[in-house]
């Protein structure tokens, strides 16, 4: 079987970050008294559901450690590797850091798919690592019933510049660096609904590095940062709000969206992860049409950075973004928490 004839997505029950365990189930898994052990040098653990762990070396520098892997979201092996690696490396950028090394995680059904196809996946991962300026230094592989690929990535960051998802403040404006709709477009493609002019758009967005995060970290007015992945914009924004004790007002029309995404939602191209996200976070939302809900809960794979920015830093953030070819528009704001109001209001 050649790399050109296979459809990797046929060999997995999930796709990309959409195969994440739901937040509700994850809460049960992670609930443990032992998890309360605290190392004073561990600046960021799993208590705020940040993008990565951060360990203070005590010399002004901290180490960032993260891992991310998933099943195929596209059929092309090389692109699958690129997307999975780009998604994993993004966690380092979301913390404001610089990646320095990665190792691969590979699960492969060796009796179903040839090692040559696995090599193409790995080469895609290596290509993404080179784009980030790091080596794919090793890894671990197992014989698995479904193809899985990802990375464990190590990075560094000046301790004073670590960006968490829990340090946002009321008054911050919200910015998103990539358009929403990755889950919708990839689902539309699987259902043979995707128009020719939209072919490859989701892959292009997923392969785009969030390298700007390291530069955003240098801006004092960037108070919080996270990447939007499997829990959708609603999930990751809710976690930012919960961690900081604030609420959000979002302008739906200002949210960047992939072309055709609203049409595909109406045609039923909604991934299964969308409903799981709504089941976990829907109670935090105000009233809104079903189509709006489905986009805000759409699981993103290798999605954009969500930034909480003080108004006085807006111009500097936009200028920095432009240096990376990113055009930013505020999609909302954070406000003081008030009882009786939805955590995330859509206008």
Curated annotation (Swiss-Prot):
Q: Which residues form the active site?
A: 17
Q: Which residues bind ATP?
A: 20, 48-50, 68, 91, 139-141
One Gene Ontology term of the biological-process aspect is: selenocysteine biosynthetic process
GO molecular function, one example?
ATP binding
Comment on bound cofactor: Binds 1 Mg(2+) ion per monomer.
UniProtKB keywords: ATP-binding, Kinase, Magnesium, Metal-binding, Nucleotide-binding, Selenium, Transferase
EC number(s) given by UniProt: 2.7.9.3
Q: Where exactly is the site Important for catalytic activity?
A: 20
What is the catalytic activity of this protein? hydrogenselenide + ATP + H2O = selenophosphate + AMP + phosphate + 2 H(+)
State the source organism's domain of life.
Bacteria
Keyword Endoplasmic reticulum part of the UniProt annotation:
no
Binding annotation for Mg(2+): 51, 91, 227
Q: Which GO terms describe its cellular component?
A: cytoplasm
Family annotation (Gene3D superfamilies): PurM-like C-terminal domain, PurM-like, N-terminal domain
Pfam families xref list = AIRS (PF00586), AIRS_C (PF02769)
Which metal ions or organic cofactors does this protein require, according to UniProt? Answer: Mg(2+)
Subunit info?
Answer: Homodimer.
In UniProt terms, what function does this protein have?
Synthesizes selenophosphate from selenide and ATP.
Q: Which family does it belong to?
A: Belongs to the selenophosphate synthase 1 family. Class I subfamily.
Classification via HAMAP family: SelD
- The protein's name is Selenide, water dikinase
